[in-house]
From Swiss-Prot:
Full protein name: HLA class II histocompatibility antigen, DP alpha 1 chain
Effect the entry attributes to changing residue 259 to P: In allele DPA1*02:01, allele DPA1*02:02 and allele DPA1*04:01
Domain Ig-like C1-type: 118-210
Listed result of changing residue 104 to A: In allele DPA1*04:01; requires 2 nucleotide substitutions
Residue span of region Alpha-2: 116-209
The keyword Transmembrane is annotated on this UniProt entry: yes
Organism lineage string: Eukaryota, Metazoa, Chordata, Craniata, Vertebrata
Any Pfam family: C1-set
Cellular localisation: Cell membrane; Endoplasmic reticulum membrane; Golgi apparatus, trans-Golgi network membrane; Endosome membrane
Gene behind the chain: HLA-DPA1
Species of origin: Homo sapiens (Human)
Any GO CC annotation of this UniProt entry: cell surface
Membrane topology: Single-pass type I membrane protein
UniProt xrefs under PANTHER family: HLA CLASS II HISTOCOMPATIBILITY ANTIGEN, DP ALPHA 1 CHAIN, MHC CLASS II-RELATED
Amino acid sequence: MRPEDRMFHIRAVILRALSLAFLLSLRGAGAIKADHVSTYAAFVQTHRPTGEFMFEFDEDEMFYVDLDKKETVWHLEEFGQAFSFEAQGGLANIAILNNNLNTLIQRSNHTQATNDPPEVTVFPKEPVELGQPNTLICHIDKFFPPVLNVTWLCNGELVTEGVAESLFLPRTDYSFHKFHYLTFVPSAEDFYDCRVEHWGLDQPLLKHWEAQEPIQMPETTETVLCALGLVLGLVGIIVGTVLIIKSLRSGHDPRAQGTL
């Protein structure tokens, strides 16, 4: 086995082992009914990103620890005002995980783990109105290990401005999901693709999206419908008038009255 193949196998098996260990509590939480659930998720690996430490509350991201800047980053500013978390706590956990990773690499039998390919969907954040700013969301789901290369294409050309992404978010089945965002102005002429590369895919996966123009009815159809509606309205008025007149006449008909 080539050295690079061996390292690939090591990465896969170690990542699977670490995810099982640190997401194990999520599996148990799924069997218990609870009003609220908080989740810490942490992993390290030999491929970028080299690690992650984050916290969720009821599946909403609260904060993560920036491993390069060594600081806590809150998803919303209000969270940081209401709660606190020392980044050193997350960094200490990452250091322990790295030590465990090195030990597992040395003791691993290099058994290849399964790479789970992602499921990808693309959708707009808001209802689409041509010419109105919006955000395209690319949701990459149910993949393992947490290694992705995601790019946006507009009319087949690479887009680098107006892009953003989430962290790798844990799932209760030990896999991950992730969001990538693209701010754009919908146009009838433009089309977009979210291009995803992952070890579980034989080739890059492109998920296509383009604005759907509203269906315009021909003028002749609109005219026919308007005329039909007008005719039905007139018929209703005539029928109603006839029924009212008949009702009034029957009320004044002597034969309809009882015996004196």
